[in-house]
């Protein structure tokens, strides 16, 4: 083959290939830990100004009927990752040590043979990264959890509740320590720094990034309160931590825009579950329920999407009911990529809804399972403690205290 003869043709094709790559949107999922829908200004929150998160809503689309897939960390994260209801993946409360997991009738880690949204993007040629809290397996006495790379991530940095925690933030086996080189009050700053490094490294190619900070989870430790353990769950400590998180997320979004990738980046902002403590339901916007509850305050979350290239700014959707399990098929559709081969998830493709082109009503029901036995962690206030099964169907939500197996033989029905 005469390469000199064909080089002009190859050169002519390169711009086309580059153009096609540039049209693939980047995806960033900002997944806050234990944030209530009433925490931030654009949802009516008044604790402290949250100008950067509010601007994200002003520049994009805010949803008022979005649900997490569970009222607590691990199953919520598994639902978003797999597009499956947590009941199907065998994880129904936060992953703990082996004995506690057994008492709560759950697995020790997310099965890496199950679907993974990141893997679908990786298969499509995206650079993939996870930065922040993991909590889908590993840590404590669970030493056989799969590597985060097994779920489709090229790069990762994670906290102690993971198979390979980052040394800078895990000097001890707890959420933070004075011995950590990155202090508790600088966690989101650190995660944003690492996220910016990831974006700069991959800005010439499509990327998929989880940015999952954990500082909205107690203990809240602003620098000036670092020695006052008794104040780490007070509103006085909460407010500056929220303000700092907003500041750092604003820095990240500004950097995306300065790097010229913001226009073609889908930013999802949401939370894994409801707040704890809720400060007398203020953090849940006065919805009943908190973290560890299937009432609305435990599972109805803030949800904002910014995608300047495709989403008209300043929109609010009050009608469409979305859930974390929908994100896998929906984001794949918006990005123009395929889900994994044989994928059959519980989530639905709501790409038109996500892009602000429709306020379509949900065609399938949602379900949640939490608290099936006495070993689960429940809200301290009995008013917030819910039945352990819930279904949302249309405008109705059913909460039930038991699940019956309907055998053909009536004598088996109890």
Residue ranges and their predicted role:
Residues 93-126, 134-207, 213-225, 237, ...:
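Formylglycine-dependent
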Residues 405-414:
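Single conserved hydrophobic/aromatic residue that forms the stacking wall/gate
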Residues 48, 141-152, 219-222, 231-234, ...:
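Histidine-centered active-site microenvironments of extracellular/periplasmic hydrolases
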Residues 22-61, 134:
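Active-site-proximal N-terminal segment of extracellular/periplasmic enzymes that hydrolyze or transfer
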Residues 81, 158, 162-177, 250-259, ...:
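Substrate-binding rim/cap in mid-to-C-terminal beta-strand-loop elements of soluble/periplasmic
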